[in-house]
Structure formats: structure tokens, C-alpha cells
């Protein structure tokens, strides 16, 4: 009897554990969300649960009220316009949830990145939607890293893999996230690509250039859910202002996506597997600008771009400073000696003093030696 009870208890715990991880974007299953009138709202590569929320591109909020798992369809109630991002409210939310190490107050801009689904790739660019090695998602990671670094941000990118792509992937990537958080970054990004088949849902134009939309995902089953949501809303609001059409939408799902680890943690999906990978890579430049603005302010981009120019100009600035000082010295010497001959001696003496005898004195000594010969 005791053995049976123990086996039953273990089986129940395993089932609950599996269910908890399955909440987080089950792969290879598409769910369709419709409103109460039957109009299509969105498609998700993963399960949708009652209570999940969705913020559309035009900031309309939907709350799921029922789900038919056999038909892979969810019905959502329109709730009107999602309240606009409120900076004061966000500050209060982050103040109560922030776990960032106060010791990291050195002014350094630092963002940490990783990819939970290490196989995600793009059929148009990688030749397959899933690759065990050299997955296309890491090309997107590297492109975003480079774009952020050009803005003056230090990026810690983990290339750890968390295969296979199953319900336990987030458990494996959690270890990576925890290691990255030891660095006390300003934000923690989990980079993905979507799995919906219609690439047109991600095709867009920004500033007249073709690029990919980006979907933001927030896990509502975690203590940081409010902070994660505000972070996502801030990203969308900033992107809508700077690059209208870049952010596809925000999905707030039942899982946690490891976001309980950090208030400024977000999952970003760059395009889908049927989209041209180059478009997903192009979107990283826009997202880097958005993230830099969100985390460090409007002037951060200009500062980042100006740093290289300042460094490049430093050498020429020093040269001109020396030249001006030298010219002033020559004018003064000429005025005080009255002759060009004496001026030469004056300059040689000054050069000897400035260079510790390497110039000027050495020439005079050589001339003296020749005279003695």
C-alpha cells in the first residue's frame, strides 16, 4: 500500500512539473485567438490559456475567457485600449521589484543576452527551421550585440545551448540566466524567433526599408510580472514613437519564461522561421536604438556614436595643442634674442629641456666632439 502511494505521489509531482514547464510556449502547436464575435485576433506558436492577455499593435487589450484545446482556439474579450505607459508608475513598480545589485553603480551600460531555444533558425537563410549546430538565432544575437556596442553598451552574450527544444528548455536556460545576472546587467534579453507559418505577419517597413517586426512576450506567472509588463510597454511605446510598426504586439502568457529572476527581463521574437533571416537581422539595429533609449535615455545613442569620433579626434587635438605652444615659444624666442642665429640656439636649448636632453643637447655635443678631432 505504501509503495503504491509513493509511486502515485511521484507520478503526480512529475505531472505537475511537466505541466508547469509546458505552460511556456509549447512548440509545434499553433493556437488561434479570436474575439467574442469570431474575428481573428492573433496566432501563437504555443498554447493559450484562460487568463492570458494580448496587447495588439494598436494597443488594444484582450483577455482570454475560454479555450478549446481540441480546436486549438482561444476566445478573448476586448477590454479597450491598454493604459499608456506611465513613467511614474513604472518607477514605482521597478522600485518595489528591482533586485539589481546596488554594488554595480559604476555608470557602465551593460545588457545580458541568451537564447533559450538554441536550435531556432530561418528556412530562408539557414536552410531549415531548426538546427542543432550553428542555429540562425545566434546570428541575430550577434547582430543585436554589435548594434548595441555601437551605441556604447557593453553586451554579455551567452552562446550556451539548451537543447533539445522541449518543455524543459527553460529549466536548462535558467542556469544561464542566473549566471548572467551575477553581472548585474541593466536588462536581461532572451532572443527567439516565432514559429507561425505566415511570414507576412512579420513583414514591415521602417523608414522606407523592409525589416522584421518584433514580438514581445511576458510571463504572467511570476512575482515580477507587473515589472516585466511595464518594461515591455516601455519598449513598445518607445518603438512606436521612433519606428512605428517595428513592434508587432505583446503577449502576456501563463508561463514565466524565467522572468521571475529579474524585473527588466523580456523575451523578444525576431520574425518567424519562414521569414528571410536578413530581415530579422536588420531589425536588430532598430531594436538596439530602442533599448538604448529605454534604458539610458535619448542622449545615449548620440553619446555612443560620438565616442568613436572623440577618440579619433583626440590625437589630432593633442598635435595642434603642441603646435600652438611651440609656435608661441618661437615667437617669444625671436623677440628676446633679436637674431635668427641666437633663435636657433634658444630653440635647441628649449628642446633639450623638453626632451630630457634627447634633442638639442645631443646635437651640440656631437658638434663639440667633431671640433676636438
Regions found by a protein language model. Name each.
Residues 2-22, 319-336:
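Sec-dependent N-terminal signal peptides of Gram-positive bacterial secreted proteins and lipoproteins
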Residues 23-38:
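Short, basic/aromatic beta-hairpin or loop at an interaction surface
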Residues 44, 55-116, 121-124:
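Non-catalytic propeptide/linker segments at domain boundaries
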Residues 47-49:
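Short, well-ordered loop/turn sites that connect or cap secondary structure elements
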Residues 126-201:
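Catalytic-core regions of hydrolytic enzymes
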Residues 176-182, 186-266, 274:
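Membrane-proximal low-complexity regions enriched in glycine and acidic/polar residues
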Residues 249-306:
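Active-site-adjacent mobile loop/cap segments within catalytic or ligand-binding domains
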Residues 305-373:
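C-terminal single-pass membrane-anchor helix
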Amino acid at each position: 500500500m505504501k509503495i503504491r502511494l509513493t509511486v502515485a505521489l511521484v507520478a503526480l509531482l512529475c505531472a505537475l512539473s511537466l505541466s508547469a514547464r509546458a505552460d511556456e510556449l509549447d512548440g509545434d502547436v499553433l493556437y488561434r485567438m479570436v474575439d467574442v464575435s469570431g474575428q481573428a485576433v492573433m496566432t501563437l506558436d504555443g498554447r493559450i490559456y484562460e487568463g492570458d492577455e494580448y496587447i495588439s499593435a494598436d494597443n488594444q487589450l484582450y483577455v482570454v475567457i475560454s479555450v478549446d484545446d481540441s480546436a486549438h482556439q482561444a476566445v478573448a474579450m476586448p477590454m479597450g485600449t491598454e493604459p499608456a505607459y506611465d513613467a511614474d508608475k513604472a518607477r514605482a513598480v521597478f522600485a518595489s521589484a528591482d533586485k539589481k545589485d546596488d554594488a554595480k553603480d559604476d555608470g557602465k551600460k551593460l545588457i545580458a543576452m541568451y537564447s533559450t531555444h538554441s536550435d531556432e533558425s530561418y528556412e530562408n537563410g539557414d536552410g531549415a527551421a531548426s538546427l542543432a549546430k550553428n542555429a540562425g538565432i545566434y546570428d541575430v544575437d550577434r547582430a543585436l550585440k554589435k548594434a548595441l556596442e555601437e551605441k556604447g553598451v557593453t553586451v554579455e552574450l551567452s552562446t550556451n545551448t539548451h537543447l533539445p527544444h522541449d518543455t524543459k528548455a527553460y529549466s536548462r536556460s535558467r542556469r544561464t540566466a542566473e549566471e548572467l545576472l551575477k553581472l548585474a546587467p541593466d536588462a536581461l534579453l532572451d532572443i527567439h524567433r516565432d514559429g507561425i507559418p505566415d511570414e507576412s505577419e512579420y513583414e514591415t517597413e521602417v523608414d522606407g526599408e523592409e525589416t522584421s517586426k518584433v514580438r514581445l512576450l511576458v510571463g504572467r506567472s511570476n512575482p515580477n510580472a507587473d515589472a516585466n509588463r511595464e518594461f515591455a510597454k516601455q519598449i513598445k511605446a518607445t518603438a512606436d514613437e521612433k519606428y512605428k510598426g517595428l513592434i508587432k504586439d505583446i503577449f502576456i502568457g501563463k508561463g514565466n519564461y524565467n522572468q521571475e529572476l529579474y524585473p527588466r527581463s523580456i523575451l523578444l521574437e525576431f520574425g518567424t522561421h519562414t521569414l528571410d533571416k536578413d530581415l530579422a537581422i536588420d531589425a536588430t539595429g532598430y531594436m538596439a536604438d530602442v533599448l538604448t533609449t529605454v534604458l539610458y535615455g535619448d542622449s545615449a545613442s548620440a553619446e555612443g556614436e560620438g565616442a568613436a569620433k572623440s577618440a579619433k579626434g583626440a590625437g589630432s587635438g593633442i598635435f595642434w595643442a603642441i603646435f600652438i605652444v611651440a609656435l608661441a615659444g618661437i615667437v617669444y624666442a625671436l623677440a628676446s634674442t633679436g637674431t635668427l642665429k641666437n633663435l636657433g640656439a634658444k630653440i635647441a636649448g628649449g628642446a633639450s629641456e623638453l626632451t630630457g636632453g634627447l634633442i638639442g643637447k645631443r646635437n651640440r655635443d656631437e658638434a663639440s666632439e667633431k671640433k676636438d678631432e
